[in-house]
Amino acid sequence: MRGTLYIVAAPSGAGKSSIVNATLARDPKIALSISFTSRAPRPGERHSEHYHFVSAEEFQGMIAAGDFFEYALVHGDWKGTARQSVEPQLAAGHDVLLEIDWQGARQVRQKVPDAVSVFILPPSRQALDERMRKRGQDSEDVMAQRLAAAREEMLHFEEFDYVIINETFDTAVSEMCAIFTASRLRRQAQQQRHAGLIQALLD
C-alpha cells in the first residue's frame, strides 16, 4: 500500500523542529524528508542532517530542472523538498514527514490531497517572542522581521487538518504521535493494510 504523507508547519519559534524530532524518535515508521535551503548554516547545523545547504544559484538550477516537490521563498531564503526524497518512498509504502512552511504545505496539498497536515501554534505571543529571542542567532532588525512574519504565518492555521498548541512540550509530542496513530487507523488505511483479514472475516 502507498505510504502516508505528513505535513508539519509552524511559525518560527513555535518549537516545530523539537517536536518533530522527539516524535520521530518515538515513531520510527516515519521518515523525515531533509529540505534544501539557500541560507547559510546556523551554529550547530550540519549539512544533510538539518538541511541540504546549497547556493541560491544551485537552488535556482534545481527549480529549472523540476527537481522540487515543493519550494518557497521564506524569510528571504529559498527552501524546498526534492521530489526524489518523497515520491519513491511513498510509492514503496513508507510514511514521509515534511517539515515545511505554509506556502510549501499549500503546494503539497494540491498535489497530494490526502496528505495529513498539522500546524503548531505557540501558547501566546509573549511565549513566541521569548522563544525566538532565546535563540540569540539574529540581530534585532532580523528578529523584528521574523516576529512580524511569524504573526503573518499564524493566519494560515485554518488551512491545516490538525492544530497543536505547544504549551507543554511533552503534551505536544504526545498529541503529534496521536495524530499519526489516528491516521493509520482510518478505514481506508486499515482496509488496505488488512485486506486479507477483513475479507476472511466477511466471507
Swiss-Prot record:
<keyword id="KW-0808">Transferase</keyword>
<dbReference type="Pfam" id="PF00625">
    <property type="entry name" value="Guanylate_kin"/>
</dbReference>
<protein>
    <recommendedName>
        <fullName>Guanylate kinase</fullName>
        <ecNumber>2.7.4.8</ecNumber>
    </recommendedName>
</protein>
<dbReference type="InterPro" id="IPR027417">
    <property type="entry name" value="P-loop_NTPase"/>
</dbReference>
<feature type="binding site">
    <location>
        <begin position="10"/>
        <end position="17"/>
    </location>
    <ligand>
        <name>ATP</name>
    </ligand>
</feature>
<dbReference type="GO" id="GO:0004385">
    <property type="term" value="F:guanylate kinase activity"/>
</dbReference>
<dbReference type="GO" id="GO:0005829">
    <property type="term" value="C:cytosol"/>
</dbReference>
<dbReference type="InterPro" id="IPR008144">
    <property type="entry name" value="Guanylate_kin-like_dom"/>
</dbReference>
<comment type="function">
    <text>Essential for recycling GMP and indirectly, cGMP.</text>
</comment>
<keyword id="KW-0067">ATP-binding</keyword>
<comment type="similarity">
    <text>Belongs to the guanylate kinase family.</text>
</comment>
<keyword id="KW-0963">Cytoplasm</keyword>
<keyword id="KW-0547">Nucleotide-binding</keyword>
<keyword id="KW-0418">Kinase</keyword>
<dbReference type="InterPro" id="IPR008145">
    <property type="entry name" value="GK/Ca_channel_bsu"/>
</dbReference>
<feature type="domain" description="Guanylate kinase-like">
    <location>
        <begin position="3"/>
        <end position="181"/>
    </location>
</feature>
<dbReference type="InterPro" id="IPR017665">
    <property type="entry name" value="Guanylate_kinase"/>
</dbReference>
<dbReference type="GO" id="GO:0005524">
    <property type="term" value="F:ATP binding"/>
</dbReference>
